[in-house]
Curated annotation (Swiss-Prot):
Signal peptide: none annotated. PROSITE patterns: RIBOSOMAL_L36. Belongs to the bacterial ribosomal protein bL36 family. The keyword Ribonucleoprotein applies. Keywords: Ribonucleoprotein, Ribosomal protein. GO terms for biological process: translation. One of its GO terms (molecular function) is structural constituent of ribosome. It comes from Solidesulfovibrio magneticus (strain ATCC 700980 / DSM 13731 / RS-1) (Desulfovibrio magneticus). It comes from the Bacteria. NCBIfam families: rpmJ_bact (TIGR01022). This is Large ribosomal subunit protein bL36.
Amino acid sequence: MKVRPSVKKLCPKCKIIRRHGVVRVICDNPRHKQRQG
């Protein structure tokens, strides 16, 4: 999980979602998981 000020898609499989007001990126590749912090 990377915590970044700005999250973006790193590959075509990445999806940007909002959970409880937190922006996250979920992906098949676990190295692409991100959260806005």
